[in-house]
Each structure stands twice: as structure tokens, then as C-alpha cells.
Regions:
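N-terminal helix-turn-helix DNA-binding core of bacterial DNA-binding proteins
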Residues: 9-50
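Basic amphipathic alpha-helical segments that dock to polyanions
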Residues: 51-58
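Beta-hairpin "wing" of winged helix-turn-helix
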Residues: 61-76
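Exposed loop/turn and edge beta-strand positions of beta-sandwich/beta-sheet ligand-binding modules
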Residues: 79
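Amphipathic alpha-helical dimerization/coiled-coil segments
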Residues: 88-121
Length: 121
């Protein structure tokens, strides 16, 4: 019997940061963009094209989905779509964090530390 492949492919920076932003709460697009910038300490600025293109691909891949939660229209724009991370998305994020942890361990063993960088995606 063939062993089931449970390994997740490495994530793009955009997908990683979107999953990270959704890991603690459901959010709409603009809020995700702001959380990406905050989570990266201002080093990653995600534009709407990258965000919504990535969201579409992530929904198709089953990493995120639209939230069933209805927002109070008096508190928020009812046209906003909120997104949530799925079980598969949580597993993919955990696998990516494990990869990063392994890379960091190797870099620490080699006494290699990255320079500060900033980029747009």
C-alpha cells in the first residue's frame, strides 16, 4: 500500500503572510493587508492585486474559505467578505513554520544572520 503524501509544498510569501494574518481571527481584505504589514513589522507591503489574486488561489486550494459569520451592518460594511483559515490552511502554515525553524537552526549553527530587508509583494 502506498504511503499517503502529507508533505506541504513551501508557501509563497504572500500565502504565508495571509495564513498568518488569518491564524488568529477572521478578517476582510483590507484588514488582512494591514495585518500583513504589522506582522512583518512593515517589511512586507501587500497590494490589492497580490492579495485578492492570492485569496482566490488559496480558496481553490482549500487553504482558506469565506466566513459564514455575518457582520453587523451598523458596525461594518455589509458588502465586505470575511475570510477564515481552514484545517488544511492551518496544517500548511504549521509545516511552513517548521521549515523556517529548521532553516533558522542551520543559520544559527553556521553563525549566519540575515541583513535587514524590506520588499513589496
Amino acid at each position: 500500500m502506498a504511503k499517503k503524501n502529507t508533505t506541504h509544498k513551501p508557501l509563497t510569501p504572500a500565502v504565508f503572510y495571509i495564513l498568518l494574518a488569518l491564524s488568529t481571527q477572521e478578517s476582510h481584505g483590507y484588514e488582512i493587508m494591514k495585518r500583513v504589514e504589522s506582522d512583518s513589522q512593515g517589511k512586507v507591503k501587500m497590494g490589492p492585486g497580490t492579495l485578492y489574486g492570492s485569496i482566490g488561489r488559496m480558496i481553490k486550494a482549500g487553504l482558506i474559505g469565506e466566513s459564514d459569520k455575518k457582520i453587523d451592518p451598523t458596525m461594518d460594511d455589509e458588502r465586505r467578505i470575511y475570510y477564515k483559515i481552514t484545517g488544511l490552511g492551518k496544517k500548511a502554515l504549521a509545516a511552513e513554520l517548521e521549515r523556517y525553524s529548521e532553516i533558522l537552526m542551520v543559520a544559527q549553527q553556521k553563525r549566519i544572520f540575515p541583513n535587514t530587508f524590506a520588499y513589496d509583494i
